[in-house]
């Protein structure tokens, strides 16, 4: 059986007995570009304490792509795994935020 690496670096780090490091960042392109080249295992786009903007989240994910890193590594796994923290699911019935974030391309959800 051939061992494969995980697309989600956070899960991979914990699965190997390590500690996964991540940081919360705003949903903006500058943060996406800066954090994509960081040494974090993952980043969490903050959507709970700021307006939910699925278009901005999509742009952030696009700007995280490093085509050279993908070509050099022969893997589509991102260097830094993107997650999204969604707004609280209260009386507003906001579960759809999780679906939107996952459909846009995040690798996981942080529930408040």
Show where each model-derived region lies.
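Expand to "…catalyze enediolate/carbanion chemistry for C-C bond making/breaking, isomerization
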Residues: 1-112
């Amino acid at each position: 059986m051939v061992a494969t690496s995980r697309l989600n670096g956070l899960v991979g780090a914990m699965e190997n007995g390590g500690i996964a490091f991540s940081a919360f960042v705003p949903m903006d392109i500058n943060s996406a570009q800066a954090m994509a080249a960081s040494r974090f295992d993952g980043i969490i786009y903050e959507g709970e304490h700021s307006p939910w903007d699925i278009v901005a989240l999509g742009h952030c994910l696009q700007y995280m792509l490093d085509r050279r890193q993908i070509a050099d590594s022969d893997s589509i796994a991102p260097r830094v795994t993107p997650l999204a923290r969604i707004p609280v699911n209260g009386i507003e019935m906001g579960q759809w935020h999780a679906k939107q974030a996952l459909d846009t391309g995040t690798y996981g959800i942080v529930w408040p």
